[in-house]
């Protein structure tokens, strides 16, 4: 019996989908930048993504583009950046559930300005991060920016590894020789 799962994404916009990205997460990744952010961090890497209406609607064609990139045997997983992915609510949750269903062997990384500790259990935002293998949390802070931070913009940000719903600090992954440039 073939099971097909399709969850509706209605209001999520994106700016860019990149097939081969080696900067945002471990290995070769497909990356998507969603639009909309309410943090407006000084010296943000992507201020053009603050407006939720910027970019294009993440429709079935965009989703199929991401899925086709994830089918590539060289692709290790999906990276979700922004903007602020957690502002996408049910749309982001549905999208990540589909990615998890169709590509269980691929890892999912997500960057958010929210801190995991501030998210309410059972909230949509918390359900989103539970779909991810790695979450980089915290707002970008100019005075804590560092050139030697592999997957973070500033040292206050923390890389968390999801181990069965428990988030374990994993900043040491930046020092793994396999992932250095």
What are the residue ranges of the model-derived segments?
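Structural recognition of alpha->loop->beta junctions
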Residues: 121-144
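A generic structural signal for alpha->beta connector loops
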Residues: 11, 105, 131-132, 156
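N-terminal pre-triad scaffold of radical SAM enzymes
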Residues: 13-40
């Amino acid at each position: 019996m073939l099971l097909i799962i399709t969850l509706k994404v209605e209001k999520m916009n994106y700016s860019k989908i990149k097939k081969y990205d080696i900067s945002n997460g471990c290995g070769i990744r497909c990356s998507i930048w969603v639009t909309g952010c309410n943090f407006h961090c000084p010296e943000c890497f992507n201020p053009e993504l603050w407006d939720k209406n910027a970019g294009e609607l993440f429709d079935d064609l965009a989703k199929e583009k991401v899925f086709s990139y994830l089918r590539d045997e060289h692709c290790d997983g999906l990276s979700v950046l922004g903007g602020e992915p957690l502002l996408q609510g049910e749309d982001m949750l549905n999208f990540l559930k589909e990615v998890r269903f169709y590509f269980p062997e691929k890892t999912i990384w997500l960057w958010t300005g929210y801190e995991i500790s501030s998210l309410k259990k059972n909230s949509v935002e918390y359900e989103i991060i539970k779909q991810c293998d790695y979450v980089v949390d915290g707002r970008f802070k100019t005075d804590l920016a560092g050139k030697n931070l592999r997957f973070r913009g500033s040292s206050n940000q923390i890389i968390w590894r999801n181990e069965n719903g428990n988030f374990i600090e994993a900043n040491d992954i930046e020092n793994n020789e396999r992932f250095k440039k």
